[in-house]
């Protein structure tokens, strides 16, 4: 079933002009630490290469795709539509049946912004999900600036802000409610509590 779902998504994206990109499974730690400081470094699976440099098993797909786009696709006609279907690796505390290896399928629309770009990627996501045969799905939109603005409005200290971010990311809604309780009925607390 997993392979059929993956193939259905691939077909839908390719029909919309998205090309597959495959990135290295092992990258230098610095690629992720500098480009995406929001990634939890404690969850990265670290490897030391023979020259002593710290490498990681790919914890995310967007960061290496952005690196490749910036270094190897700089003369490509814009916009560039890419999709990936590859595993990411993260250290999972307590295991709980998870082995730290997750298939991640997604798409990147590079070189344009605004409403037309948003429409393109959202219609591709809708088509891909529809193709899988699932008829009851929800598309969640995330933008780091929304979260940052709400945290600033909330007046949370750095430790509280990081804790709230992780709870939202992990969809730990009961714990999120507890973490937001000290902020009372502030509109920013209500908005953060309603984030998907």
Task: Please give the residue ranges for each predicted region.
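Extended, charged alpha-beta segments that form solvent-exposed binding/catalytic grooves
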Residues: 1-63, 67-196
